């Protein structure tokens, strides 16, 4: 909270920075339409053999095609991402916004904003949310990682601790 790191914390930051620096990460903050993302992903697959594509977040994307509604546009985007994943043989993680009413309760698949196609096209859907809504500004709190859709297996939930100071999920020890 103070912005001052201990010597141990600074050492961890330095070590993490070195690890990240050596990773083959490619960050594109300019591409906003799905057609350009397809081109960019194919180039990266051919040139760098990428093994994962992450979209932050799906509802920010646009299509160059003229469609009748935003729902149709998001459907085209998710379908394109699904086909791209199959073509490039890599997982694609698409972060999504939820409808506003989902913020107060346990989210469900129909809370995915702007399209039912997101839940239909996704192989897996995972929600992360607070176990209890409270007014306390806790630094560490329990959160639920909720796998609500898994095309190849069962759904499940797990409770973990989340440390806001360092954005870290911590497994709870089972006794």
Regions found by a protein language model. Give the residues of each.
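Short, basic, glycine/proline-bearing loop/turn elements
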Residues: 23-28, 66-67, 98-104
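Helical hairpin unit composed of two closely spaced alpha helices linked by a short loop
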Residues: 50-94
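Active-site-proximal loop/turn and secondary-structure-junction residues that shape catalytic pockets
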Residues: 31-33, 59, 98-99
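Walker A/P-loop NTP-binding active-site region of P-loop NTPases
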Residues: 1, 59-62, 121-123, 147
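C-terminal regions of RecA-like/P-loop NTPase motor modules
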Residues: 8, 35-50, 79-88, 100-175
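Conserved phosphate/pyrophosphate-binding and hydrolysis machinery centered on Walker-type P-loop NTPases
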Residues: 30-34, 67, 71, 115
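Hydrophobic/aromatic beta-strand patches that form the interior of the parallel beta-sheet core
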Residues: 26-28, 93, 126
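Cytosolic-facing regulatory segments adjacent to core modules
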Residues: 1-49, 63, 158-159
